[in-house]
Swiss-Prot record:
Gene giving rise to this polypeptide: psbJ
Main location: plastid
Keyword Membrane: yes
Function in brief: One of the components of the core complex of photosystem II (PSII). PSII is a light-driven water:plastoquinone oxidoreductase that uses light energy to abstract electrons from H(2)O, generating O(2) and a proton gradient subsequently used for ATP formation. It consists of a core antenna complex that captures photons, and an electron transfer chain that converts photonic excitation into a charge separation.
Protein's UniProt name: Photosystem II reaction center protein J
Organism domain of life: Eukaryota
Length: 41
């Protein structure tokens, strides 16, 4: 795997951050719906 990160954000970093953000939003949504606040979303 060549080092092609010349002034750009690496693709794996974007994927990791995007995946963590999506998981975080899903966790918050499911937790809110479990508690009873998710219905307002």
């Amino acid at each position: 795997m060549s080092n092609t990160t010349t002034g750009r954000i690496p693709l794996w970093f974007v994927g990791m951050v995007g995946g963590l953000a999506a998981l975080g939003l899903l966790a918050i949504f499911f937790y809110g719906s479990y508690v009873g606040l998710g219905s307002s979303l």
